[in-house]
C-alpha cells in the first residue's frame, strides 16, 4: 500500500517536474561572470591589477586560416557580450584578420569589482594593456553601441595604434545631460537595473535593436542577459550595470569627434532610437533624442576622415539583424583603398 501510494505521488509530480525542466531550458540561470553560457571560441583570461583590484578580462583570440597581417579588435555594447560578435568574427577571420574580442571589466565573463571608478579612459587603458600582453599594437578597432563610445576614447588616447576605426551605431553621438535628461544617482540606476527581466529585455531590444521585428535568432542574447539576473549574482550584475550607466551618461565623447585623425567608418541603422535615460526626460525632449539618421550625418560631418554607411531599415544592431548585408558593407569599408579615398559623409 505504501509503495503504491509513493508511486502514485511520484506520477502526480511528473508534469510539474517536466514543466520545471522545460522552464530551466528556456529560462537558464547563469553566474555573475556568465558561467554556464557557452562562447563560440575558447575564452582566455588576461589577469591584471587596477585600482587595488585583481581583475580578469575574458577574451577570444581567433586566428585566421590565411592571415592578411591585420588585427581587428571588437568592442561590445552594454547589453551585449563578446559572444554576440560571432558572425562578425567569422566574417573578419575569413577575410584574413586576427580577431580579438574582449569582455570589458564589469561585463559578461569578466570581473565585476564592487568598488571601481568606471571611465572610458580606464576601460581603454585595460584594453590597451590586454593587447600589449598579446604583442598587438596596430589594430582595426570596431566598436558597437557603448563599445563605440569606448572605441572613440581609445582612438583618442592611442591614435598611433589605431589604423582604422569602425563605429557601429555608437551611442554618445549626443550629450544627453546637455539635452536635459535628468541626472540619476548610481543608487537610482541600481534600483532600475534590479527590475530587469527577460520580458523587459526582449521588449526593449525588439523596439530599439530590431526596428519592431523579432526573430528566434535574437532570443539567445535575451537569455544571455536575463540568465545573469536570474542567477546567484543578480545583485552584483545589477550594481555593475548601474556603475556603467553612470559612466555612459556623464562622460560624453561627442565634443571630441573632430580630433579623430584616422579613417573612420560610421555605420548607422536609421531605425535606431537608442538614448540612455530617454524615458526619464520630459516628453518634449524625449521626442528629440536618439534620432540616428540626423546624428549619423552630424557625426560624419565632424570627423575629418569619415565615411558614413546607412542601413535605412535596420535598428541598433545591424550586425545581428542583417549580418550578410552588414558584413559586406563592413569588409568593403575597411579596405585600405575605401578608407583612404573617402573623406566626409556618404
PLM region spans:
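N-terminal cap/lid segment of alpha/beta-hydrolase-fold proteins
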Residues: 32-64
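Glycine-rich "HGGG/HGxG" loop immediately N-terminal to the catalytic nucleophile
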Residues: 44, 83, 104-120, 176
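Conserved HGGG/HGGXW glycine-rich cap/lid loop of the alpha/beta-hydrolase fold
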Residues: 51, 55, 62-109, 329
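Conserved acidic catalytic loop of the alpha/beta-hydrolase fold
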Residues: 121-139
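Flexible "cap/lid" loop of the alpha/beta hydrolase fold
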Residues: 152, 156, 165-196
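Conserved alpha/beta-hydrolase catalytic His-Asp/Glu region
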Residues: 196-256
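Conserved serine/cysteine hydrolase catalytic core
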Residues: 230-298
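Catalytic active-site module of serine/aspartate enzymes centered on a nucleophile-bearing elbow/loop
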Residues: 293-346
Amino acid at each position: 500500500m505504501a509503495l503504491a501510494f509513493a508511486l502514485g505521488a511520484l506520477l502526480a509530480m511528473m508534469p510539474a517536474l517536466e514543466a520545471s525542466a522545460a522552464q530551466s531550458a528556456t529560462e537558464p540561470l547563469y553566474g555573475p561572470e556568465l558561467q554556464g553560457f557557452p562562447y563560440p571560441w575558447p575564452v582566455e583570461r588576461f589577469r591584471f591589477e587596477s585600482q587595488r583590484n585583481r581583475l580578469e578580462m575574458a577574451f577570444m583570440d581567433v586566428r585566421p586560416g590565411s592571415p592578411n597581417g591585420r588585427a581587428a579588435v571588437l568592442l561590445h555594447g552594454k547589453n551585449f557580450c563578446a559572444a554576440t560578435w560571432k558572425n562578425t568574427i567569422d566574417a573578419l577571420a575569413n577575410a584574413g584578420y586576427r580577431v580579438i574580442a574582449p569582455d570589458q571589466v564589469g561585463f559578461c565573463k569578466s570581473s565585476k569589482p564592487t568598488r571601481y571608478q568606471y571611465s572610458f579612459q580606464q576601460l581603454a587603458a585595460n584594453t590597451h594593456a590586454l593587447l600589449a600582453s598579446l604583442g598587438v599594437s596596430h589594430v582595426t578597432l570596431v566598436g558597437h553601441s557603448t563599445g563605440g563610445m569606448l572605441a572613440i576614447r581609445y582612438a583618442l588616447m592611442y591614435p598611433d595604434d589605431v589604423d582604422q576605426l569602425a563605429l557601429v551605431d555608437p551611442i554618445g553621438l549626443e550629450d544627453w545631460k546637455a539635452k536635459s535628461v535628468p541626472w540619476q544617482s548610481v543608487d537610482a540606476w541600481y534600483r532600475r537595473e534590479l527590475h530587469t527581466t527577460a520580458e523587459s529585455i526582449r521588449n526593449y531590444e525588439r523596439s530599439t535593436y530590431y526596428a519592431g521585428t523579432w526573430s528566434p535568432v535574437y532570443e539567445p542574447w535575451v537569455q544571455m542577459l536575463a540568465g545573469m539576473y536570474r542567477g546567484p549574482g543578480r545583485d552584483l550584475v545589477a550594481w555593475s550595470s548601474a556603475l556603467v550607466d553612470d559612466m555612459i551618461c556623464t562622460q560624453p565623447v561627442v565634443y571630441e569627434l573632430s580630433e579623430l585623425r584616422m579613417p573612420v567608418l560610421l555605420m548607422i541603422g536609421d531605425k535606431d532610437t537608442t538614448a540612455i535615460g530617454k524615458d526619464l526626460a520630459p516628453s518634449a525632449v524625449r521626442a528629440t533624442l536618439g534620432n540616428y539618421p540626423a546624428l549619423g550625418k552630424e557625426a560624419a560631418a565632424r570627423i575629418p576622415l569619415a565615411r558614413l554607411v546607412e542601413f535605412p531599415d535596420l535598428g541598433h544592431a545591424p550586425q545581428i539583424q542583417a549580418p550578410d548585408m552588414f558584413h559586406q558593407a563592413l569588409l568593403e569599408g575597411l579596405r585600405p583603398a575605401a578608407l583612404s579615398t573617402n573623406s566626409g559623409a556618404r
